[in-house]
Amino acid sequence: MAKLSKMAQAKRKLKFPVRQYNRCPLCGRPRAFLRKFQMCRLCFRKRALQGEITGVIKSSW
């Protein structure tokens, strides 16, 4: 429940724009946010391994 309230709070327009921060829309995680994909690293990894994100492949060397 606390995570839902934090997600709602992050969506609101703040008085000072510099205080705005990104949150993962899938799980609500505030840290490790990837701007290019608009999700956190954990959700990105899970979806990439399932093949739901086009153009992303697991690297090996």
Swiss-Prot record:
Cofactor list: Zn(2+)
Coiled coil (UniProt feature): none
GO annotation, biological process: translation
Gene Ontology, cellular component aspect: cytoplasm; small ribosomal subunit
Cofactor comment: Binds 1 zinc ion per subunit.
Sorted UniProt keywords: Metal-binding, Ribonucleoprotein, Ribosomal protein, RNA-binding, rRNA-binding, Zinc
UniProt xrefs under InterPro entries: Ribosomal_uS14, Ribosomal_uS14_bact, Ribosomal_uS14_CS, Ribosomal_uS14_sf
Pfam families for the chain: Ribosomal_S14
Gene3D superfamilies reported in the protein's UniProt record: 30s Ribosomal Protein S14, Chain N
Residues that bind Zn(2+): 24, 27, 40, 43
PROSITE patterns: RIBOSOMAL_S14
Gene Ontology molecular function: any one: zinc ion binding
Subunit structure: Part of the 30S ribosomal subunit. Contacts proteins S3 and S10.
Entry-linked PANTHER family: 30S RIBOSOMAL PROTEIN S14 (PTHR19836), SMALL RIBOSOMAL SUBUNIT PROTEIN US14M (PTHR19836:SF19)
Summary of the function given for this chain in its UniProt record: Binds 16S rRNA, required for the assembly of 30S particles and may also be responsible for determining the conformation of the 16S rRNA at the A site.
HAMAP family: Ribosomal_uS14_2_B (MF_01364_B)
Family per similarity comment: Belongs to the universal ribosomal protein uS14 family. Zinc-binding uS14 subfamily.
Protein known as: Small ribosomal subunit protein uS14
Organism for this UniProt entry: Anaeromyxobacter sp. (strain Fw109-5)
Source organism phylogeny: Bacteria, Pseudomonadati, Myxococcota, Myxococcia, Myxococcales
Originating gene: rpsZ
